[in-house]
Design a protein with these regions (language model features):
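Structural motif
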Residues: 38, 211-213, 247-251, 294
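Gly/Ser/Thr-rich active-site loops/lids in small-molecule metabolic enzymes
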Residues: 266-282, 313-326
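A Trp-anchored, charged/polar loop motif used as the substrate-binding/catalytic surface
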Residues: 193-196, 225-240
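C-terminal motif of bacterial Sec signal peptides marking the signal peptidase cleavage site
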Residues: 17-20
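Active-site His/acidic residue clusters
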Residues: 135-141, 215-220, 232-236, 240-245, ...
Length: 389
């Protein structure tokens, strides 16, 4: 009888714990996100993440995310996207043609999640290790028919009323321009920016600043040290007191660069660097409780696989099938209020709506366009050709 009473008491305690946990989960899922940290590992799919785990022998921050989904990355024009079309889809509701930035296939400008949330009163920021005018960051603020219009993109960035801070490289598009425009001078004297060339000099009380810390892209991870995680922490300190919350986009830009070169050592350095940046974001979100963190990629680069060439299942190597992009899906990882929306299979142009909805806001955009009718045409043609050989 006594044993039965103890078991009954234990059952009540366990049931109470399960109910409390369930209520906590429901409360977290019903809460609205005040802040959003949107992180993009350029060129990063599951092979890159798992390769970093294997080679480092360490757990990755990615493993801490409670919600994971699969993202289809094809563009409006191709089964394999470039970073311009991929970035535009992640930033807006629109798939566009490769090389196009911030516009749909008909060259009509589209509204990005950064712009939409800024219009709702949120502060915004961008942190990258590429040019600040490179395809992925530019997809959040620029509207140009071709991604290589760097000087035009720089002007659009300078004149953008929605960006409160931006950190990265690419000073040559501002200060060494073909049109001889002193864009830095104009930014500081006419457009309200404070421009730094060193992250350590930043005054986080400034309401609008740019850190353009290199003439070109930032150096490789092995040479730039902890620039990216420090930049994320600096941005978070700046945005922390935003009255209506904030939106921060962070890109691990050079994972893609390394995979284009099939350089595994460089790729590993960039993956670990990006993981440290993700940790900084996740730590902030766990402390605040009102911050949604979404981590994904624009595409996979390199066709990375992890085989054993000997077929003995003992010696894993990094093996690349291309020096370019692939059509492999990528993953999306989510934590915080609204994170449960980021599960299952989705298109890359669905993430903006999920973020807006997580913030308790109606998605301010056109309806999501239908899938291109000729999807996988090139793949099917290749399969048909191979079957005839």
């Amino acid at each position: 009888m006594k044993k039965l009473s103890v078991l009954s008491l234990l059952a009540v305690v366990i049931l109470g714990m399960m109910t409390a946990c369930n209520n906590k989960t429901k409360a977290q899922e019903s809460a609205k996100a005040v802040n959003v940290i949107y992180m993009i590992g350029d060129g990063m799919a599951l092979p890159q993440v798992y390769a970093a785990m294997l080679a480092s022998g360490e757990d990755m921050t990615f493993q801490q995310f409670p919600y994971i989904g699969v993202v289809d990355t094809h563009s409006a024009s191709n089964d394999i996207t470039d970073s311009a079309a991929g970035g535009t889809a992640l930033a807006s509701d629109h798939k566009t043609n490769n090389a196009m930035l911030g516009v749909n296939p008909d060259s009509i400008p589209v509204k990005t999640v950064l712009e939409a949330l800024a219009e709702q009163g949120k502060k915004t920021g961008i942190v990258v290790t590429s040019y600040v005018t490179h395809a992925t960051p530019a997809a959040f603020y620029a509207k140009v028919p071709h991604r290589k219009q760097y000087e035009d993109i720089a002007v659009q960035m300078a004149e953008n009323p929605y960006i409160n801070l931006i950190i990265g490289g690419g000073m040559k598009h501002f200060a060494q321009r073909k049109d001889s425009l002193d864009l830095i001078g104009r930014m500081e004297n006419e457009l309200g920016w404070k421009v730094y060339d060193n992250l350590a000099e930043v005054d986080v009380t400034n309401q609008k600043y740019a850190v353009i810390a290199d003439t070109n892209h930032m150096p490789k991870a092995a040479d730039r040290g902890d620039f990216l995680p420090r930049a994320v922490k600096t941005a978070l300190k700046t945005l922390d007191n935003a009255e209506n919350g904030f939106f921060l986009m962070v890109e691990g830009s050079q994972i893609d660069f390394a995979c284009h070169g099939n350089d595994s050592t460089w790729m590993m350095d960039e993956m670990m660097d990006f993981d440290y940046a993700v940790k900084a974001a996740l730590d902030y979100a766990k402390e605040k409780g009102n911050t949604l963190v979404v981590v994904t990629a624009d595409h996979e680069t390199g066709g990375l696989t992890l085989p054993d060439p000997q077929g003995k299942y003992t010696n894993v190597v990094f093996d690349y099938s291309t020096g370019s992009h692939t059509c492999l899906p990528v993953l999306v990882y989510a934590y915080g209020p609204g994170a449960e929306r980021f599960t299952g299979w989705m298109q890359n142009n669905e993430l903006k709506a999920k973020i807006m909805n997580a913030c308790g806001m109606e998605n301010i955009s056109d309806s999501i366009p239908k899938e291109p009718k000729k999807r996988f045409k090139a793949v099917k043609a290749n399969l048909d050709s191979n079957s005839n050989n």
